[in-house]
Amino acid sequence: MAVRKFKPTTPGQRHKIIGTFEEITASVPEKSLVYGKKSSGGRNNEGKMTMRYLGGGHRKVIRIVDFKRNKDGVPAVVKTIEYDPNRSARIALLFYADGEKRYIIAPNGLQVGATLMSGENAAPEIGNALPLQNIPVGTVIHNIELRPGQGAALVRSAGNFAQLTSREGKYCVIKLPSGEVRQILSTCKATIGSVGNSDHGLESSGKAGRSRWQGRRPRNRGVVMNPVDHPMGGGEGRASGGHPRSRKGLYAKGLKTRAPKKQSSKYIIERRKK
C-alpha cells in the first residue's frame, strides 16, 4: 500500500493525499455477503438528533466480515482483495473448500491465490487464525478475541498490530497498539500478521467536500457557541471558555472515563500510554 500526492493545480488538490488502491483486485463486492445500510443522519427512532456532525455522504452497503474464523480445518483460497467503505482496512474474499464464501480483514502481505487455515492445527503464517496457546511467543497478531468464540474485538483497524509477549498459566500476555499490556485467555483466537493498508494514517482529504462524501458534517467549537448550547460558550468578546468541557459538562482533557470498578481491570498489567 502506498499513497499518492497531487500537483497543486487547485486548492483541493494541494493537500490531497490518498491511497493508490494498487492492491485492490475487484470493484464489485460478493452479492451474497452484502446488505443495504440505512443512513440515520445522527437521529434516533423519534427523529431527534443524538449525534451531531453526521449526515449525507455516499450510499454504502455493509460487507459481512467474518471475525470468528470458526471454520477450523477447512482450507480457503484468497479470491480477491477489496475496498470496504465502512472501515480503514481492506477486506479479502475467501473461497472455502466446501463452497462457502466469507470476507476477512486483509492482513499486510496477503496475496490473491494464497491458502489460509484456521484452528489449532493451522501453521502460524500470515492470515491464519489460531488460538493464542498455539501461537509462538513474540509473534505479531491482530483480530484478537476477548472471549472464546465471541469474534475478534481488538486490533482491527488499518496498520495496527499487537504482540504476544508471554504466557502465564491459562492466560497469554498481549501488548496492544495503545501500549496497554493485558492478559487474555489462551483459548481465544487471533490472526497472524498485522492489518493491511498501513499507510492509511498518511492520507489527507485535501478539501471539505471529501469529508462530506464520507458523511461528516462541519464540527463547531464549543467556545464559539452561546451558553445555551455549550458549557464553554458565551462571554464578552473572545473568551477562553474556562476549563475544557464536553457538551454534557464533563471535563474534556485528562478526565479518566474508565469505570473504577470494571471487572476486566484485573487483567490489565500495564495501562495504555497517554
From Swiss-Prot:
Annotated stretches, region: Disordered: 195-274
One GO molecular-function entry: structural constituent of ribosome
The keyword Signal is annotated on this UniProt entry: no
Record-level GO cellular component terms: large ribosomal subunit
Pfam families the record matches: Ribosomal_L2, Ribosomal_L2_C
Keyword match Ribonucleoprotein: yes
Sequence similarity: Belongs to the universal ribosomal protein uL2 family.
Protein name, UniProt field: Large ribosomal subunit protein uL2
